[in-house]
Amino acid sequence: MKDTMKPLTYDQKLFTLPGNSTDYDVKSEQSDLFKNVPNASHVVLFFDKEVKVRFNTEVMPLAILPISRSPFQSPTGFLEIKNLFLTEANGDDVEVEVWLW
C-alpha cells in the first residue's frame, strides 16, 4: 500500500516581546517564523504574561489571552494564519513561544 501521509512541516520560535509593544509584527520581527509554514492551519502560543493577539492583520479585533490561557491552541479549522500581531500594554517583557503547522 502506498504511503499517502502528507509530510508534516512546522515552524517554532522562542522570543521576548518587549513591554509596551503594540501590534508587534511577528512575521517581520521573527523572520524565521512562517518560512516552512507560510499559511498555518494551527498555532500554539506559550507566554508568561498576558498578551493580546490579532490574527493576520492589524485591523482584526484583539483577542485577550490571560496567563491562565497559556498555552493557547487554535481550534481545528480556526482560520488560515499568515501572521500574528502581539500587544503588551503593561510595560513588562513577555517570553513567547510560537508553534505553527
Kindly give the residue locations of the regions a language model identified.
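Short, intrinsically disordered N-terminal pre-domain segments
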Residues: 1-20, 99-101
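Beta-sandwich interaction modules
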Residues: 30-35, 61-81
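Short tyrosine-centred short linear motifs in exposed loops/low-complexity segments
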Residues: 19-21, 51, 92
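Surface-exposed ligand/attachment interfaces on beta-rich extracellular proteins
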Residues: 16-37
